[in-house]
Amino acid sequence: MDIKGTTRVCGLIGNPVGHSVSPAIHNNLAQLTGKDMVYTTFKVEKGDVASAVRGAYSLNILGLNVTVPHKSEVIDSLVDIDPLAKAIGAVNTLVRVDGGFKGYNTDILGLARELEYEGIELADSKVIILGAGGAARAITFLCSSKNAQCVYLLNRTVDKAEVIAQAVNAHFNNDKVIPMNIADYADIPGEDYVVIQTTSVGLHPNDEAVVIDDEAFYKKAAVGVDIIYNPAKTKFMKLIKAQGKNAYNGLKMLLYQGVSAYELWNDCKITKEEADEVYKCLQKELGINE
């Protein structure tokens, strides 16, 4: 990597950030596309977000990614925000504009792109989402924005699912999102659902943990997506595949949220072939063999 006086800087703000694979994504993309750009991480404590964003703008930083715990707090430091990111209430990408930064949520763009490349259509699809955290909220907004037929939002604490359902249904002026206690999954009618697992259950080292351990539930799936990428094959994915259906982990979602941010910063389009090259680098860095 050749860093010069003209090299533009992008980075990740959050805490912790030492484990992040975002530098691998963006520095490989810069090398592949010949952009004079470098990406690193910045540990930012809670309460220091506003000063960090102001400092980044003063230092002529091209763009930032934002990770936990700052995705909501950073909104107050923006001069503009993408409407869907505003509705979700979470921003993970800042793009430099006149006077400051504009916020986007490329987490949902990443999942949308992964689904598109895998041939999974959300429009008119029936969806089941497991979990009701920040990722579930963003994905529920995505499903409704893509005109999913219905979205069952399952969580152990149904109150959290109800809050998301009310927000999404109000935003899109419909009642397609249906909150449900996860214990009542048998009440979901029919089959052929896109099932998206958004919780941390099954994350390494708890590889054999799963939110629902009942073969009957997985018969409802047409396809499964787990946002976890370590392990590469979660128990959730194995249960989907046992029904003869395809299942995907979250590594490509992680990759494509980065690709979407990179495109916003550099006003360019990354081809699927270029993204696939970076995907191989990510697999190598993480020691993942699929």
Describe the predicted segments one by one.
Residues D2-E118:
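Phosphate/diphosphate ligand-binding glycine-rich loop within oxidoreductases
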Residues V9, V38, K126, Q149-V151, ...:
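Residues at the starts of beta-strands that form the adenosine-phosphate
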Residues G14, N105, D124-S145, N155-K160:
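Glycine-rich adenosine-cofactor-binding loop
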Residues V44, R156-K160, A232, G250:
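Short beta->alpha hinge that forms the Motif I/post-I loop of the SAM-binding pocket
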Residues I120-K126, Y218-K220:
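Short helix-loop-beta connector
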Residues K146-F172:
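NAD(P)-binding Rossmann-fold cofactor-contacting core
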Residues D175-A247:
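Rossmann-like adenosine-cofactor binding region
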Residues V223, I227-E290:
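Adenosine-phosphate binding glycine-rich loop
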